Amino acid sequence: DALLYVANWPEPRRYPWSQLLIARAIENQSYVIGVNRVGMDGKGHHYTGDSASVDPRGDADVMKASKEDVLHTVLHREALDDFRAKFPVAMDADDFGLML
């Protein structure tokens, strides 16, 4: 399982962007791919990229900043299944419903 986030986070928000990618990977026990823009927009906001691939443990195995580039990463299904088997948080889920 993998989550893909395409974003537009400017340079002053680099830290929250990276931390949110890590948090999403951990809480969902999934790989997370975060793709953020680079360069300058029409209002003068600077974007540093900081695109990343994060594993379910929260380790960023690829991170790029400041320039347009192509990232390559390999996601390992067996490693994901093994991690989930050893740390089965999904077993704590409760059935619930939303009444609108």
Tell me the role of every PLM-derived stretch.
Residues D69-K86:
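A short, polar/charged loop-to-alpha-helix boundary motif
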Residues D1-L71:
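CN hydrolase (nitrilase-like) catalytic-core segments centered on the catalytic cysteine
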Residues G42, A60-D61, L80-D82, A90:
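A broad, structure-centric signal for solvent-exposed, well-ordered loop/edge residues
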Residues D81-L100:
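Cysteine/selenocysteine-centered motifs that mediate thiol-based redox chemistry or coordinate metal-sulfur cofactors
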